[in-house]
């Protein structure tokens, strides 16, 4: 399977890859997103093209029911990244105005962060943090780590 949530533009092709030593039986829960139930053998991959209709599509596995993934189809999506364990991430973008957004379990969380990407320098650091949820207690490090590792920041033209 893939990360918990991915945000893509309409028509984007996604590959579901099985890196486990056993098969998975993947399906999309609404049955309306163009993916019929099928066995994904170990080492195999299957392509899926995101619908043209924006929305959230949930994928499950009959073999391992606890596996869940969401594909959010968003027309403004430009890039998707996953943060490291420290919550840091990087990506290459053309100069322009963008909006940074975090997602968790297929839903947008926190506040959008407007960002202006300029021609130079090569690396531009954000000065404002992406607020993706309520502040955690300082002594609650385990929960905070788990929370941030599941967030998926998404860049979109805005």
List where the protein language model places each region.
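Extracytoplasmic copper-binding redox domains, predominantly the cupredoxin/blue-copper superfamily
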Residues: 1-147, 151, 155-158
């Amino acid at each position: 399977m893939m990360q918990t949530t991915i945000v893509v533009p309409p028509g984007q092709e996604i590959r579901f890859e099985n890196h486990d030593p056993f098969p998975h039986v993947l399906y999309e829960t609404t049955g309306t997103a163009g993916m019929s139930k099928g066995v994904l053998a170990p080492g195999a991959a299957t392509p899926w093209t995101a619908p043209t209709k924006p929305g959230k599509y949930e994928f499950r596995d009959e073999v391992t029911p606890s596996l869940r993934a969401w594909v959010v189809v968003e027309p403004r999506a430009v890039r998707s990244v996953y943060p490291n364990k420290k919550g840091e991430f990087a990506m290459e973008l053309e100069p322009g105005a963008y909006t940074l957004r975090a997602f968790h379990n297929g839903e947008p969380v926190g506040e959008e962060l407007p960002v202006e990407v300029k021609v130079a320098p090569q690396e531009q650091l954000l000065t404002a943090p992406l607020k993706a949820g309520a502040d955690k207690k300082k002594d609650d490090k385990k929960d905070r780590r788990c929370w941030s590792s599941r967030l998926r920041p998404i860049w979109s033209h805005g």
